[in-house]
């Protein structure tokens, strides 16, 4: 295995840990700073929103930078942002620091993905991308639960120091292990957004956005959605997040094989339908330990299993624009995540927290509708010779 890809994956692990660990410490953050849980939940919103908005902008403005310089700068900003979070005296400082950390992630993640793909021969590109992205999915299995456990032993600030430490280790690894890499061809922001003119691509990106807006509206407030099982125990919540992360990693790997065998369309449909039904049942499944674990497993399998066929579909539609489309898909995912914090907060104000899954299920159902519309446009284009997706 190429060591350079593992180094890039280490940075993705840091970024992923920061993305997913906050949900498990929201009650502590809210209590410590004397604010409501919905307000504390905007930590997730601002981190994800800054990533989504700044990712294409940074890529356009810093496209001429050497890759290692851009990767290191992103990780340094990421570490500084998380250190400020750990030291923040008020919710205002906390929220501002999440924007800084999001900027660092926006500089690092798309660059790492594109760099990983450029380091290998075209026939090995998918495998290289899988290794780099594995850092992100493994963060759900290891980083987030470990961070939650640290918060249980110490406090939420210790968790943010942990994230900063992981980012520092990743930066050191990039500095010493990654050789200088020439800058990739730069692209303007308009060029990056050009594929959005294709309805097939736009609808596929909307599928990603809506699906993860639904999934993360529950994840952001997972501590209160499953509190009838965890009873406020950080260790029990960490256990649930560990199960979710392991299921996510398995779902990601299995979805790759299934997509190669059956095509992206069937896997996208199956993942969305199962996920929507699973969320719709959480008002009842989250009341008992066994059904909660089952719901968490299904959620992890389908939620992360959706990413692979979505990426496969986009690359098949426009192979020459693959790096740009991966960046746009990541942006769509993070817009969904940032929207989830707001939608989840609104949901907590409207109805019982244990019914938040009903709203999540509705959003995933809308994502399924977008996927069906994408299918129609793909089939129509195939008739006149454009690439089709099975």
Please describe what each predicted stretch is.
Residues 55-66, 251-263, 348:
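Helix-to-loop junctions at the C-terminal end of transmembrane segments
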Residues 34, 66, 87-93, 231, ...:
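Helix-breaking motifs and short loop linkers at transmembrane-helix boundaries and internal kinks
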Residues 91-93, 122-176:
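Helix-loop-helix hairpin linking two adjacent transmembrane segments in secondary transporters
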Residues 70-83, 266-280, 361:
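Structural signature of the two symmetry-related core transmembrane helices
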Residues 81, 92-100, 290-298:
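Paired small-residue
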Residues 53-92:
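Conserved MFS/SLC helix-loop-helix module at the cytosolic interface between two early adjacent transmembrane helices
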Residues 265-310:
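C-terminal transmembrane helical hairpin of 12-TM major facilitator-type secondary transporters
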Residues 97-136:
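Cytoplasmic helix-loop-helix junction between adjacent transmembrane helices
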């Amino acid at each position: 295995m190429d060591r350079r890809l593992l180094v890039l994956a280490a940075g993705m692990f840091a970024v992923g840990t920061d993305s997913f660990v906050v949900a498990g410490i929201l009650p502590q953050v809210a209590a410590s700073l004397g604010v409501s849980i919905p307000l504390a939940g905007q930590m997730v919103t601002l981190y994800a929103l800054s990533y989504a908005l700044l990712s294409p902008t940074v890529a356009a403005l810093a496209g001429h930078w050497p890759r290692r310089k851009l990767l290191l700068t992103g990780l340094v900003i990421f570490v500084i942002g998380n250190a400020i979070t750990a030291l923040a005296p008020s919710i205002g400082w906390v929220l501002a620091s999440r924007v800084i950390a999001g900027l660092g992630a926006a500089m690092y993640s798309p660059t790492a993905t594109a760099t990983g793909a450029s380091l290998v021969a075209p026939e090995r590109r998918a495998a290289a991308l899988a290794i780099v992205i594995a850092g992100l999915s493994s963060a759900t299995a290891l980083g987030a639960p470990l961070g939650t456990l640290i918060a249980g032993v110490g406090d939420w600030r210790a968790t943010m120091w942990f994230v900063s430490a992981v980012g520092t280790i990743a930066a050191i690894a990039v500095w010493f292990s990654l050789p200088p890499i020439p800058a990739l061809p730069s692209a303007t922001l308009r060029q990056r957004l050009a594929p959005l003119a294709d309805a097939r691509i736009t609808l596929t990106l909307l599928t990603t956005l809506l699906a993860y807006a639904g999934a993360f509206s529950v994840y952001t407030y997972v501590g209160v959605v499953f509190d009838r099982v965890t009873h406020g125990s950080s260790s029990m919540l960490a256990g649930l997040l560990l199960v979710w992360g392991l299921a996510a990693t398995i779902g990601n790997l299995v979805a790759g094989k299934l997509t190669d065998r059956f095509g992206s369309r069937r896997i996208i449909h199956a993942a969305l339908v199962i996920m929507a039904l699973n969320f719709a049942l959480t008002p009842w499944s989250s009341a008992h330990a066994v059904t909660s674990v089952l719901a968490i497993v299904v959620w992890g399998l389908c939620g992360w299993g959706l990413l692979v066929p979505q990426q496969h579909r986009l690359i098949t539609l426009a192979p020459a624009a693959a790096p740009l489309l991966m960046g746009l898909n990541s942006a769509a995912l993070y817009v969904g995540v940032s929207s989830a914090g707001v939608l989840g907060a609104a949901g907590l104000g409207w109805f019982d927290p244990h019914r938040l899954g009903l709203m999540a299920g509705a959003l995933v159902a809308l994502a399924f509708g977008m996927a069906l519309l994408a299918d129609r446009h793909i089939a129509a284009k195939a008739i006149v010779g454009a690439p089709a997706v099975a």
